[in-house]
UniProtKB/Swiss-Prot annotation:
<keyword id="KW-0677">Repeat</keyword>
<dbReference type="GO" id="GO:0010564">
    <property type="term" value="P:regulation of cell cycle process"/>
</dbReference>
<dbReference type="Pfam" id="PF00004">
    <property type="entry name" value="AAA"/>
</dbReference>
<feature type="compositionally biased region" description="Basic and acidic residues">
    <location>
        <begin position="268"/>
        <end position="281"/>
    </location>
</feature>
<dbReference type="InterPro" id="IPR003593">
    <property type="entry name" value="AAA+_ATPase"/>
</dbReference>
<dbReference type="GO" id="GO:0043161">
    <property type="term" value="P:proteasome-mediated ubiquitin-dependent protein catabolic process"/>
</dbReference>
<feature type="region of interest" description="Disordered">
    <location>
        <begin position="860"/>
        <end position="892"/>
    </location>
</feature>
<dbReference type="GO" id="GO:0020011">
    <property type="term" value="C:apicoplast"/>
</dbReference>
<dbReference type="InterPro" id="IPR029067">
    <property type="entry name" value="CDC48_domain_2-like_sf"/>
</dbReference>
<dbReference type="InterPro" id="IPR003959">
    <property type="entry name" value="ATPase_AAA_core"/>
</dbReference>
<feature type="compositionally biased region" description="Low complexity">
    <location>
        <begin position="252"/>
        <end position="267"/>
    </location>
</feature>
<dbReference type="GO" id="GO:0005829">
    <property type="term" value="C:cytosol"/>
</dbReference>
<dbReference type="InterPro" id="IPR003338">
    <property type="entry name" value="CDC4_N-term_subdom"/>
</dbReference>
<keyword id="KW-0131">Cell cycle</keyword>
<dbReference type="GO" id="GO:0097352">
    <property type="term" value="P:autophagosome maturation"/>
</dbReference>
<comment type="similarity">
    <text>Belongs to the AAA ATPase family.</text>
</comment>
<dbReference type="InterPro" id="IPR003960">
    <property type="entry name" value="ATPase_AAA_CS"/>
</dbReference>
Length: 1229
C-alpha cells in the first residue's frame, strides 16, 4: 500500500488542474480587480497622504491607504497561491520600517519634472554627506520603467524576489517625493535667482538648471507632479498584480529572452536619459509650449545658453550622415591616431558665432570641459577660437559648427576640423573692429557702436582672433565685422585674446570694402557648386583622401587611385569642380589646357608633359588637371597625325610611372569620352570615370541659389518655380538665365541711355517712387519689400535686439525700412567714416573741371592720382550733402536710392526663359510650345486620354511606384489629315511644361552609311539630357514602314531598328514620351505598335457638330465679329469638314473682309482726290488712319467663303480609317 503525502492536500495533485483554473478566473481575478478599483478611488480622493508613515500601517491591508500593496510582498511572491491562506507577519512590517529609515539620510532634494509627448519624467538629485554623487531615475507612464540602482537587464536566474524588492523601492521613493514636497517648495520660495548651480566634483564643471520664474508655471508643474505620481503608482500596482498572476504557474522558469521578466519592460539607460549638465535645451522648448506666458523669455534664455532650436534637430535628422561616403574617415578616426580630428555633421546658422557642439566622449578624449575655449583649425591653415558645448545626442567623432566657423575655416559638411584645447587666451585691453560696407544698413557710427557691438561683445568673455569674421543680426540685417587688431596688457599685436570686463571695443575709422580686402575673391569653392552633391562626394573620396591620408590605403594594402576622368555635356561644371577641389584641398595644382601642349617642333610637346609631371612629383600633394583631354588623347587607331600618337604614348608612360601613394593624382575632363584612346581608360590610369549629369529639379534650385545669392531679387521671384520650368538646363544655362533676367531689368529702367547726364538723372528721379526717395542714400546691396504687413512686423520687432538668436536671413526681404527722419540728422553726414558718402569738396571738383575738358561716361570715375591724393587730404572738409542731390560731378555715380530701384522681378525671369534654351539642345529646335487646350476645339475624350498617358506620370509618379507599375512610353495618333494631331502633341507638351522635340520623318535619313542611326541615337541622347521631354515624330510612316516590304531600302530598316532599340532603352529615371502621328497607319511596322513601345493608338476622327462649334470658337476668339454671324449655324453647314478645312474657311472669310476694306479705302481716296482738285483752297483731306469701312467680320464674308470652300477628306477615305480602327479592336478582343 502506497502512502500519499498530505501536507498540502489541495495543491499537490495534478488531477485538480481544472479546479485551479476555476479558482484562478473566478476567485483571484475578481479580488485583484476590486483591489485596483478601490485603490484608484482612494487616489482620486487624495487619500494617499504623504504624512502616512510606514509604522502606522495595520494588518488589515484592504482598509488602509496602501490597498493591495502588502498582498503582493516579496516574501509571499515566492509562493503566490499559498499567500491567500497566510497573513502578513510582523517581520514584514519591521523590514518596511528599516527601509523607510534610509530616507533620513537624504540632505537635499531637487525635483525636476518634464512632460513631453505624454511622457512623464521624474528626476531626483540626491546629495549625501556633502558629496556630489548624483543619481538619475527616469520613469515612463506607458508601462516602461527603469530602476535606479539596478541593472536594466535582469539575469534569467534571478527570481521574483528581486522584482518585488525593486517595486517596493520605487513605491518608497515615490512616497518620499511627496513627503519632501514641502521642503522643495520652501526651498524654491527662498531662492529668488533664476538658476541653481550644482557643482560636481567628479566631473569638474558647472551645470545650470533653469528654474521657472513664474508662480503660475510653478503651480502647473506641481499639478503635473501630483497627476503623474498617481498614474505612475497605479501602473506599478497593475504591473505587479498582472506579473504575479502570469508567473503563478511558471515559478522558477526562465523567460524566452533570458533578460526580461514578465510584466516589466526594461528601458536602457542610454536610450532615454536626462542629465542636469546637459546643455541641450529641447526640454525648455517643450516647457515653453506648455507655458505660453513665458515663451519669449524662455526662448531668449535658450539662445543665450547656446541651446539649439528644434529646427536644428529636424534638419539634422533629415540630412543624416552617409556611412558609405565617410567610411574611410571613420576608420581612421576610430583608430585613435587622430584624437583632435572631427567631422562636421551639420552647419547650424542659428548658433552663436563661437559655439561648437561636440559629444561627451570627444570632450573626455580632449580633456576639456563644457564652456572651455578651444582652437579650431580648418582648411588652408585657417584658425579660429571657439567655445566647446556639450551635446549628448552627437556621436563621438561628429561636431556641429556655426555659420561664422564655416566662413572663417572654409568648411562644409563631412569636412575635417581639428580641435585643440587652448589655455593661453590673454585678456584683451582693446580690440579694433571694422564692418564691411556692403553689410551695414543706414546706421550712424554711434548707433553701430552702442546698439550693435557693445551689447554683443561687452563683458561676454568671447574669444577672438585677428582677421576672423563675426556676424551680428540687428534689425533683420546681418552685419559682418572683421577683427583687425587685438591689444593686451603685454603686447600691442596679439593674435588671440579673450574679452574681459575692462576690454575696450573700438570701431575702425574707415569701413572695409569687400572687393579691396578679400583675397582671391574669384576662387571657386564647394559652396559655389550646386546640384552635384553625389558626384562631388565621389570625386572628393577619390582625390582628397589619397592626398590627405595616403596611410589609409597603405594600411588596407591597396594602392591609391591615380586618375579620375569626368565626362558630361558642356556646361555641367566639370572645370569648376576641378578648380574647387584644387582650391579646397590645400594641394598644388597644375592645369593643362589640351591645345597648349601641342607644338610644331618635334619632341617639344612630350617634353612639356614630362616637365609638368616632374614638378608635380617634387611638390606633393599635387593635382594635375587636364582640361579637354580629348584634344590631346584621341584614339591612335583613327588618328593620322604622328604628333597626337606620340603625345598619347607619352601620357600613358607618365601615368604608368607614377609611384604608388606618392600623392600625385591626375584629374581630367572631357565632353567626348568615347573619342579618348581606350588605353587611357583602363584601371591603373584613369581608375574611375564619373559622369556629371544634367541637374534635376532640386539640383537646378541649388544652382539658382548660388547664382542669385548676390543679386537683388524682388519678393515675387520664386526660384522653386523657375527651377521646375528649366528642364534640361545645366549650370551654364542657369547662369545665362540669371544674366538675361538682370539685363532685362536694366533695359526697363535705362533704355534712355542716349539722354544727357542731367536729363538722365532727372528722368530716373521721376521714375522712383516717392516713399523710396525718402529712404535716403542706402547701401547698394540692399533691397526693399512691398509687403506692408511684413515691414510693420519687422518694425515692431526691431526694438528688441537678440544677437545669439541668429536666424537665417531672408535674402529677398533683407532691408528694414529705417526711420525716415534719421537721414536729416546732421550727425550722420558729419562723420568722416561714413562709408556711404564719398563726396569730394568743391575745390577738388573745380580742379578736376579744369583738367578734364572732355565729357566722360557718367558710369565711371575720371579721378587721376593727384585728385585722389587731394581727396584724402581734404576728407575732413566734407560738406553736408542731401542724398537727393543730382549726380555727383566728380565721382560720376548714380545715387544709391536710384540704384535700389533696380530689382530683378519674376517677369524678368519669365522673359529670360522665353529667350534661353538648354545648350545641349540648341542643335535642334527644342522649346515648350505655346499652344494650349483652349486653342484646340472639341476632342475632349482625346484630351483626357493624353492627360492620363503623359501628365499623370509626371505629376503622380508616386502612385505608379505604389502599384509597382510602369507608365506608357508612347502614343500613336492616326487619322485623316488636318484633324489636329500635331496641335494635340504641342498642347500636351505645354500642359506638362516638358521640352518638345519635333522630328520631321525624312530629316533623320542621310546618304552616308551609319549616319542615320547615329542621328537617332543623338536624338534620344539629347531627349534624355532634357528630360522630361516629348519626342514628336510627325509623318512617322516615312521612317517606320513595314520591314518585310519589297522596297530594298536598307537604310530605313536600320533606322527603325535603332528607333525600336532606343524606345526599349528608355528607363524610369529619364522621363521620355514618344508621340507619333501618321495618316497611313496600315503601312507601319507591327513591332513599333506593340505594347511597350507605342502603347496607345488614338484615332483622331473628323469633328462632330459640337467639336466643330468649339473649333470655330477657338479660331475666332480674337476676331471682331458682327452680330449677324451665327457660329452654330456655320457648324451645321460644315458637315464632313476637318479642323484644317474649318481654319481655311475662316481664313477665307477674313481675306474677303480685307479685300472689301481695301476696295472701300481706294474708293474714298479717289473721292478725296477729286474733291481736292475742285476746291484747292477750302478742301482739307481727312485722316484716313481713323477711317475703318469694315470694322467687323460679317455673315456675308462667310457666305463668300463657303462658295469657295472644299472638303479635303472624301468619305471613302474615312471608311478606311474606320475599318482600321475596327481591325485593331478585334485584335485587342
Amino acid at each position: 500500500m502506497k502512502v500519499r503525502k498530505m501536507h498540502y492536500p489541495l495543491f499537490s495533485f495534478t488531477e485538480y488542474l481544472s479546479c485551479y483554473i476555476i479558482l484562478y478566473f473566478f476567485v483571484f481575478l475578481p479580488n485583484y480587480s476590486y483591489a485596483i478599483n478601490i485603490n484608484n478611488y482612494h487616489n482620486k480622493n487624495n487619500l494617499w497622504n504623504i504624512n502616512n508613515k510606514w509604522n502606522n500601517q495595520q494588518s488589515n491591508h484592504f482598509s488602509n491607504n496602501r490597498i493591495g500593496h502588502f498582498l503582493w510582498g516579496s516574501k509571499i511572491r515566492k509562493n503566490p497561491l499559498a499567500s491567500i491562506s497566510t497573513s502578513i507577519t510582523t517581520k514584514k512590517l519591521e523590514n518596511q520600517k528599516k527601509k523607510t529609515n534610509k530616507n533620513e539620510s537624504y540632505s537635499n532634494v531637487n525635483d525636476k519634472y518634464e512632460h513631453n509627448n505624454n511622457t512623464a519624467h521624474f528626476v531626483q538629485i540626491n546629495y549625501k554627506n556633502d558629496q556630489s554623487n548624483d543619481t538619475l531615475s527616469t520613469y515612463k507612464n506607458n508601462n516602461e520603467m527603469t530602476v535606479e540602482g539596478k541593472p536594466n537587464n535582469l539575469a534569467s536566474g534571478e527570481g521574483k524576489k528581486e522584482i518585488h524588492n525593486t517595486t517596493q523601492k520605487i513605491l518608497e521613493k515615490v512616497d518620499y517625493f511627496k513627503e519632501r514636497e514641502k521642503i522643495t517648495n520652501s526651498y524654491n520660495n527662498n531662492n529668488n535667482n533664476n538658476k541653481v548651480i550644482v557643482t560636481h566634483d567628479n566631473k569638474n564643471h558647472t551645470n545650470y538648471i533653469n528654474k521657472v520664474e513664474n508662480k503660475q508655471s510653478d503651480d502647473k508643474i506641481k499639478n503635473l507632479n501630483n497627476k503623474y505620481i498617481k498614474k505612475f503608482k497605479s501602473h506599478i500596482l497593475q504591473n505587479d498584480i498582472l506579473g504575479t498572476i502570469s508567473t503563478m504557474f511558471w515559478s522558477g522558469k526562465k523567460n524566452n529572452n533570458g533578460n526580461v521578466k514578465k510584466g516589466i519592460k526594461n528601458v536602457p539607460m542610454d536610450e532615454k536619459s536626462y542629465s542636469p549638465n546637459d546643455h541641450d535645451n529641447n526640454s525648455n522648448n517643450s516647457n515653453n509650449n506648455n507655458n505660453n506666458d513665458n515663451n519669449n523669455s524662455n526662448n531668449n534664455n535658450n539662445n543665450n545658453n547656446g541651446g539649439k532650436n528644434n529646427s536644428y534637430y529636424n534638419e539634422k535628422t533629415q540630412k543624416g550622415v552617409n556611412d558609405k561616403e565617410t567610411n574611410f574617415l571613420l576608420k581612421a578616426l576610430d583608430s585613435g591616431k587622430f584624437p583632435t580630428y572631427c567631422l562636421v555633421e551639420n552647419i547650424d546658422e542659428n548658433l552663436d558665432n563661437f559655439d561648437i557642439y561636440m559629444s561627451k566622449e570627444k570632450m573626455d578624449e580632449l580633456n576639456i570641459n563644457d564652456g572651455a575655449t578651444v582652437l579650431l583649425k580648418g582648411k588652408k591653415k585657417r584658425e579660429m577660437l571657439g567655445i566647446a558645448r556639450l551635446d549628448r545626442s552627437l556621436k563621438k567623432h561628429y561636431v556641429v559648427i556655426s555659420f561664422a566657423m564655416k566662413k572663417n575655416l572654409r568648411l562644409m559638411h563631412n569636412d575635417i576640423i581639428k580641435i585643440h584645447p587652448f589655455m593661453n587666451a590673454k585678456r584683451i585691453r582693446n580690440v579694433v573692429l571694422s564692418p564691411f560696407s556692403d553689410t551695414i544698413p543706414n546706421l550712424s557710427r554711434e548707433e553701430l557702436e552702442k546698439a550693435v557691438i557693445h551689447p554683443y561683445l561687452k563683458n561676454s568673455y568671447k574669444p577672438l582672433r585677428v582677421n576672423s569674421n563675426i556676424y551680428i543680426y540687428y534689425k533683420n540685417n546681418k552685419i559682418e565685422f572683421k577683427v583687425l587688431k587685438i591689444i593686451s596688457e603685454e603686447s600691442e599685436n596679439e593674435e588671440f585674446g579673450c574679452i574681459g570686463e575692462h576690454s575696450q571695443l573700438t570701431l575702425a575709422e574707415e569701413y572695409l570694402k569687400r572687393e579691396d580686402y578679400e583675397e582671391n575673391n574669384d576662387d571657386i569653392t564647394y559652396e559655389d557648386l550646386g546640384g552635384m552633391k553625389k558626384q562631388l562626394n565621389k570625386i572628393r573620396e577619390l582625390i582628397e583622401l589619397p592626398l590627405k591620408y595616403p596611410e589609409i590605403f597603405m594600411s588596407i594594402g591597396i594602392s591609391a587611385p591615380k586618375g579620375v576622368l569626368m565626362h558630361g555635356i558642356p556646361g555641367t561644371g566639370k572645370t569648376s569642380i576641378a578648380k574647387a577641389i584644387a582650391n579646397e584641398s590645400n594641394a598644388y595644382c597644375y592645369i593643362i589646357n589640351g591645345p597648349e601642349i601641342m607644338s610644331k617642333h618635334i619632341g617639344e610637346s612630350e617634353q612639356k608633359l614630362r616637365k609638368i609631371f616632374k614638378k608635380a612629383s617634387e611638390k606633393t600633394p599635387c593635382i594635375i588637371f587636364i582640361d579637354e583631354i580629348d584634344s590631346i588623347a584621341n584614339k591612335r587607331s583613327k588618328s593620322n597625325n604622328e604628333l597626337e600618337k606620340r603625345v598619347v604614348s607619352q601620357l600613358l608612360t607618365l601615368m604608368d610611372g607614377l609611384k604608388k601613394n606618392n600623392n600625385v593624382l591626375v584629374l581630367a575632363a572631357t565632353n567626348r569620352p568615347n573619342s579618348i584612346d581606350p588605353a587611357l581608360r583602363r584601371f591603373g590610369r584613369f581608375d574611375r570615370e564619373i559622369e556629371i549629369p544634367v541637374p534635376d529639379e532640386q539640383g537646378r534650385y541649388e544652382i539658382l541659389l548660388t547664382k542669385t545669392k548676390k543679386m537683388k531679387l524682388d519678393p515675387d521671384v520664386n526660384l522653386r518655380k523657375i527651377a521646375k520650368e528649366c528642364h534640361g538646363y545645366v549650370g551654364a544655362d542657369l547662369a545665362q538665365l540669371c544674366f538675361e533676367a538682370a539685363i532685362q531689368c536694366i533695359k526697363e529702367h535705362i533704355h534712355f541711355l542716349d539722354l544727357d547726364e542731367e536729363d538722365f538723372i532727372e528722368f530716373m528721379k521721376i521714375s522712383v517712387d516717392e516713399d523710396k526717395k525718402n529712404m535716403g542714400n542706402e547701401p547698394y546691396g540692399s533691397s526693399h519689400t512691398n509687403n506692408s504687413n511684413y515691414i510693420n512686423h519687422l518694425t515692431e520687432s526691431s526694438n528688441k535686439l537678440s544677437y545669439t538668436n541668429m536666424f537665417p536671413l531672408n535674402r529677398k526681404n533683407t532691408l528694414l525700412q529705417n526711420d525716415k527722419n534719421e537721414m536729416n540728422k546732421d550727425s550722420s553726414y558729419d562723420k568722416k567714416t561714413d562709408a556711404l558718402d564719398n563726396y569730394k569738396n568743391d575745390s577738388t571738383i573745380d580742379m578736376e573741371k579744369k583738367k578734364n575738358k572732355k565729357k566722360s561716361n557718367f558710369f565711371f570715375s575720371n579721378d587721376d592720382e593727384e585728385t585722389k591724393n587731394k581727396n584724402k587730404t581734404n576728407v575732413n572738409q566734407k560738406k553736408k550733402k542731401n542724398p537727393n542731390d543730382k549726380l555727383d560731378k566728380n565721382e560720376r555715380r548714380i545715387p544709391a536710392y536710384i540704384l535700389n530701384k533696380l530689382t530683378i522681378k519674376a517677369k524678368h525671369f519669365q522673359h529670360a526663359l522665353n529667350i534661353c534654351n538648354p545648350s545641349s539642345l540648341r542643335e535642334r529646335q527644342v522649346q515648350i510650345p505655346t499652344v494650349t487646350w483652349n486653342d484646340i476645339g472639341g476632342m475632349n475624350e482625346v484630351k483626357e486620354q493624353l492627360k492620363e498617358t503623359i501628365l499623370y506620370p509626371l505629376e503622380y509618379k508616386h502612385l505608379y511606384n505604389k502599384f509597382n507599375s510602369n507608365y506608357n512610353k508612347g502614343i500613336l495618333l492616326y487619322g485623316p489629315p488636318g484633324c489636329g494631331k500635331t496641335l494635340l502633341a504641342k498642347a500636351i507638351a505645354n500642359e506638362c511644361k516638358a521640352n518638345f522635340i519635333s522630328v520631321k520623318g525624312p530629316e533623320l535619313l542621310t546618304m552616308w552609311f551609319g549616319e542615320s542611326e547615329a542621328n537617332v541615337r543623338d536624338l534620344f541622347d539629347k531627349a534624355r539630357a532634357a528630360s522630361p521631354c516629348i519626342i514628336f515624330f510627325d509623318e512617322i510612316d516615312s521612317l517606320a514602314k513595314e520591314r518585310n516590304s519589297n522596297t530594298n531600302n536598307d537604310a530605313s530598316d536600320r533606322v527603325i531598328n535603332q528607333i525600336l532599340t532606343e524606345i526599349d532603352g528608355i528607363n524610369e529615371k529619364k522621363t521620355i514620351f514618344i508621340i507619333a502621328a501618321t495618316n497611313r497607319p496600315d503601312i507601319l511596322d507591327k513591332a513599333l505598335t506593340r505594347p511597350g513601345r507605342l502603347d496607345k493608338l488614338i484615332y483622331i476622327s473628323l469633328p462632330d457638330l459640337k467639336s466643330r462649334y468649339s473649333i470655330f470658337k477657338a479660331i475666332l476668339k480674337n476676331t471682331p465679329l458682327n452680330e449677324d454671324v451665327d457660329i452654330h449655324d456655320m457648324a451645321k453647314r460644315t458637315e464632313g469638314f476637318s479642323g484644317a478645312d474649318i481654319t481655311n474657311l475662316c481664313q477665307s472669310a477674313v481675306n474677303e473682309a480685307i479685300k472689301e476694306t481695301i476696295h472701300l479705302l481706294n474708293i474714298r481716296k479717289k473721292e478725296q482726290e477729286e474733291q481736292r482738285k475742285k476746291n484747292k483752297n477750302s478742301f482739307k483731306i481727312d485722316d484716313t488712319d481713323t477711317y475703318d469701312p469694315v470694322p467687323t467680320l460679317s455673315k456675308k464674308h462667310f457666305d463668300l467663303a463657303f462658295k469657295n470652300a472644299r472638303i479635303s477628306i472624301q468619305p471613302e477615305d474615312v471608311l478606311k480609317y474606320e475599318k482600321f480602327k475596327e481591325k485593331l479592336s478585334l485584335q485587342d478582343f
